């Protein structure tokens, strides 16, 4: 039985025994036939080295890591079938590693865009012409944005902050993050001012009087939901002339980290501020460091153009 016949037998099994959809079968067929045509002697008799060479070839042809991984998955399934049917005495895919997916760079905002966003929040918070509920919402949003950009907190950490953070008015506070680990977070003067303004407005809402949270709400958790904050943030961005699709609380956290690194912060310090347990998580920002080094050389090297 040649490779083409064995591929057909595999597809028949996938259809009859596993109920694979037509689209799934078509995808398997394309991937297996492409592999078979790319390997001398066909796929069914291939050794591990042959399959590895094929994977190297499609990588050089520009296939994305996700496409490479999908093709390898189809090949693995094919050889499991051959082994189970007694058509192979080994599985050559057992020693092959899946292609590593490139970690996407985090979305972020420029310093100018972030400045526009925060300035807009400040203007709205100071608008005496707003009605009571709108003014309350504007003061809350201004405090949220200032604190998020000043600290780089995770959105879940931000919305669940205790009211004591604002009452103490300290330059630092402790936050409990992932894995129940605590870390010290600095607060800028602007963030403290925005929090105090919100705290004063919050004190005038009887429903909030007994809440232990800085941003209380009538929710199951007792504090503002991440979804409501994300919605309000997108609305603020649109009013600041920034595409709302470009922004989220997570993007503002990334802006905090990127802007620190652009202005000379150490990667380890940023790791601690973000609450990353492993430096490898923070290393998604190394592109910022690389850009900074290029600028440094271009600006200061005596022979730079």
UniProtKB/Swiss-Prot annotation:
This is Tyrosine recombinase XerD. It is found in: Cytoplasm. It comes from Mesorhizobium japonicum (strain LMG 29417 / CECT 9101 / MAFF 303099) (Mesorhizobium loti (strain MAFF 303099)). Site-specific tyrosine recombinase, which acts by catalyzing the cutting and rejoining of the recombining DNA molecules. The XerC-XerD complex is essential to convert dimers of the bacterial chromosome into monomers to permit their segregation at cell division. It also contributes to the segregational stability of plasmids. The active site is at residues 154, 178, 250, 253, 276, 285. GO terms for cellular component: cytoplasm. It holds the Pfam family Phage_integrase. Forms a cyclic heterotetrameric complex composed of two molecules of XerC and two molecules of XerD. Keywords: Cell cycle, Cell division, Chromosome partition, Cytoplasm, DNA integration, DNA recombination, DNA-binding. Its main location: cytoplasm. One of its GO terms (biological process) is DNA transposition. Belongs to the 'phage' integrase family. XerD subfamily. Residues 104-298 form the Tyr recombinase domain.
